[in-house]
C-alpha cells in the first residue's frame, strides 16, 4: 500500500524499515528518553476520551473552548524582570502596519524590481538606526543581540586575520556568553574575560590593560552593562583598544541612546544590540531583532554579516532599492560567506522602524528620560525599606541589582511571595554571579507607573516585616 499522499512514511512497512535503520525495535523504544510518566501509550491513547464526538456549530465550539480555558489561572502580573528582555509599551499601530500583506510574508526579496516596498522599509530601518547609533552602515537585521555579538566577533577575526584573542567583560550577559562560546568554539581563538570593578560594577581598566596585547583582535564592552550601569569609561576603553590596532565593539540598549552618547561618538568600530525594546514586545523570548552596525571602512563593511539594502538608480533613472554587496552572503560558497543568516528578522526590523518613526528624536529622548527617572525613583523607595540597592556606585539606566542577603531568606522565597500578589519580581542573578549573594536584577520602564512602583515597595516591605516577627 502506498503512503498517504499528504503524510509521508505513513505505511507500517516504511516505518519498520526506518526503525530498523535507526536501531530500535518499535516506537515505544524510540521515545525511551522521554520519562514514562509523561508519555501516553498506544492503549491509553486508544481509550482516551477526547474530541466532541459529533459535529457542532462554531459558536458552540467557542463556548466549550472558553469554558475549558476559564479553568486556567490567568493573570497579568506587574513585571519587573530585567536581564535583556524588557516590558515596554508597543503602540497598536505597529501591529496593524506589520500585519499588512506586503510585510507579513516569509518571502525573501531577492528580486528587487518587484520588492520595492519591503526593501524601502528595510532601508528606512537602516537609516533610522544609523542615525540613532551615530554609525555609518547598518545591516537590515540579525536574529538577536547574542547572535549579533557572536557575528561581530567572527567578523573581527576575519578583519584581523593574524590575531587570535578576544576580550569580553566578565559581567556580560551570561546567555550572550554561552552563545558566543558556541559560535567561536570551532575557531582557533582564545577568549579571555576582563574583570569588573567590585566598587563600580564597570570594566576594571587596570585588568583590561594587563590582558590586552598585540594578539587581541577585538574587545567588547556593553553600556548599559548587564547590571544596568552606564560604562562611563567607554571612550577611554576604545582608545586603549585602538592603540594596539584592535577593533572596539560596543553593545547597546537602543532606547538608552536617547540620553547617553551613541557608540559612534565613543569610537566604536562595530555596534550591536537588541531591538526588542523598539516595539516588539516580549513575545515569549522571540522573535527579537539583532542590531548590527559598523563605521564606514570597506574592510569592515565587506566583512559584515547579514544583508544590506542600498539606494540606486534604475536604467531609466528611477530611484531603486536593492540588496547590495551580496557577494558577502550565502550567494557565494558557504565557507566563504560572512554569515548564512538568510530570511533573518525583516518583519521585526520594520516594526522597529515604525516605532522609531512614531517617536522621532524628541520622543526617544523623552522616553529615555522617563525610564531613567522612574528607575531612580524605584531605587530610592526600595532603599527606604532597608534593601541594598547600592551594590555598585555607578549611574544606571533602567535596571539595577538589589541584594536580599540582609533579610535572612533565599530570594526564591521573596519571589514566590511577590507572585502571590500578582507581581513578578526581578531576575535572580546569584547563580551567575555567586559573589553577589542573593541578588536580583530589577528593571523599570515606561509601563511602570509611580503607583506600580509604590505597590512593589509595599509588598516587599510586608515580606520583610513578616520575616522579622
From Swiss-Prot:
Gene3D superfamilies (alphabetical): Aspartate Aminotransferase, domain 1, Type I PLP-dependent aspartate aminotransferase-like (Major domain)
CDD domains: GDC-P
GO MF entry, a single one: glycine dehydrogenase (decarboxylating) activity
SUPFAM superfamilies, per database record: PLP-dependent transferases
InterPro entries for the chain: GcvPA (IPR023010), GDC-P_N (IPR049315), GDC_P (IPR020581), PyrdxlP-dep_Trfase (IPR015424), PyrdxlP-dep_Trfase_major (IPR015421), PyrdxlP-dep_Trfase_small (IPR015422)
EC number, as in UniProt: 1.4.4.2
Catalytic activity of the protein: N(6)-[(R)-lipoyl]-L-lysyl-[glycine-cleavage complex H protein] + glycine + H(+) = N(6)-[(R)-S(8)-aminomethyldihydrolipoyl]-L-lysyl-[glycine-cleavage complex H protein] + CO2
Alphabetic keyword roster: Oxidoreductase
HAMAP family: GcvPA
NCBIfam families linked to this entry: PRK00451.1 (NF001696)
Subunit structure comment from the entry: The glycine cleavage system is composed of four proteins: P, T, L and H. In this organism, the P 'protein' is a heterodimer of two subunits.
Function field: The glycine cleavage system catalyzes the degradation of glycine. The P protein binds the alpha-amino group of glycine through its pyridoxal phosphate cofactor; CO(2) is released and the remaining methylamine moiety is then transferred to the lipoamide cofactor of the H protein.
Protein name: Probable glycine dehydrogenase (decarboxylating) subunit 1
Lineage: Archaea, Thermoproteota, Thermoprotei, Desulfurococcales, Desulfurococcaceae
Amino acid at each position: 500500500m502506498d503512503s498517504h499522499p499528504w503524510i509521508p512514511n505513513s505505511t507500517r512497512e516504511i516505518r519498520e524499515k526506518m526503525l530498523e535503520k535507526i536501531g530500535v525495535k518499535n516506537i515505544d523504544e524510540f521515545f525511551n528518553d522521554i520519562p514514562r510518566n509523561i508519555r501516553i501509550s498506544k492503549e491509553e491513547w486508544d481509550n482516551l476520551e477526547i474530541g466532541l464526538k459529533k459535529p457542532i456549530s462554531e459558536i458552540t465550539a467557542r463556548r466549550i473552548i472558553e469554558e475549558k480555558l476559564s479553568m486556567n489561572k490567568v493573570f497579568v502580573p506587574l513585571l519587573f524582570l530585567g536581564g535583556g528582555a524588557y516590558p515596554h509599551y508597543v503602540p497598536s499601530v505597529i501591529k496593524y502596519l506589520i500585519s499588512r500583506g506586503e510585510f507579513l510574508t516569509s518571502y525573501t526579496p531577492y528580486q528587487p524590481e518587484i520588492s520595492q516596498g519591503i526593501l524601502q522599509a528595510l532601508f528606512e530601518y537602516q537609516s533610522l538606526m544609523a542615525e540613532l547609533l551615530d554609525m555609518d552602515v547598518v545591516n537590515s537585521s540579525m536574529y538577536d543581540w547574542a547572535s549579533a555579538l557572536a557575528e561581530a566577533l567572527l567578523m573581527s577575526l576575519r578583519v584581523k586575520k593574524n590575531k587570535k584573542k578576544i576580550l569580553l567583560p566578565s559581567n556580560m550577559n551570561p546567555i550572550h556568553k554561552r552563545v558566543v562560546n558556541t559560535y567561536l568554539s570551532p575557531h582557533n581563538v582564545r577568549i579571555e574575560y576582563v574583570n569588573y570593578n567590585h566598587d563600580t560594577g564597570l570594566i576594571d581598566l587596570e585588568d583590561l590593560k594587563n590582558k590586552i596585547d598585540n594578539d587581541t583582535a577585538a574587545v567588547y564592552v556593553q553600556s548599559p552593562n548587564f547590571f544596568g550601569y552606564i560604562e562611563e569609561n567607554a571612550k577611554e576603553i576604545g582608545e586603549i583598544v585602538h592603540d594596539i590596532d584592535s577593533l572596539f565593539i560596543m553593545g547597546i540598549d537602543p532606547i538608552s541612546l536617547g540620553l547617553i552618547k551613541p557608540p559612534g561618538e565613543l569610537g566604536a568600530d562595530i555596534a550591536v544590540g537588541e531591538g526588542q525594546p523598539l516595539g516588539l514586545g516580549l513575545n515569549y523570548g522571540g522573535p527579537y531583532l539583532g542590531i548590527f552596525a559598523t563605521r564606514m571602512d570597506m574592510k569592515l563593511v565587506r566583512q559584515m554579516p547579514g544583508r544590506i539594502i542600498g539606494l540606486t538608480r534604475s536604467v531609466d533613472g528611477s530611484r531603486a532599492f536593492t540588496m547590495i554587496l551580496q557577494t558577502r552572503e550565502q550567494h557565494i560558497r558557504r565557507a566563504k560567506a560572512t554569515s548564512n543568516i538568510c530570511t533573518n528578522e525583516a518583519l521585526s526590523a520594520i516594526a522597529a522602524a515604525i516605532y522609531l518613526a512614531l517617536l522621532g528624536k524628541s520622543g526617544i529622548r523623552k522616553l529615555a528620560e522617563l525610564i531613567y527617572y522612574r528607575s531612580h525613583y524605584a531605587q530610592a523607595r526600595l532603599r527606604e525599606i532597608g534593601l541594598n540597592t547600592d551594590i555598585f556606585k555607578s549611574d544606571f539606566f533602567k535596571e539595577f541589582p538589589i541584594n536580599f542577603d540582609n533579610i535572612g531568606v533565599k530570594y526564591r522565597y521573596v519571589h514566590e511571595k511577590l507572585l502571590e500578589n500578582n507581581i513578578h519580581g526581578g531576575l535572580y542573578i546569584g547563580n551567575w554571579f555567586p559573589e553577589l549573594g542573593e541578588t536580583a536584577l530589577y528593571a523599570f520602564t515606561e509601563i511602570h507607573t509611580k503607583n506600580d512602583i509604590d505597590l512593589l515597595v509595599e509588598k516587599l516591605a510586608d515580606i520583610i516585616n513578616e520575616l522579622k516577627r
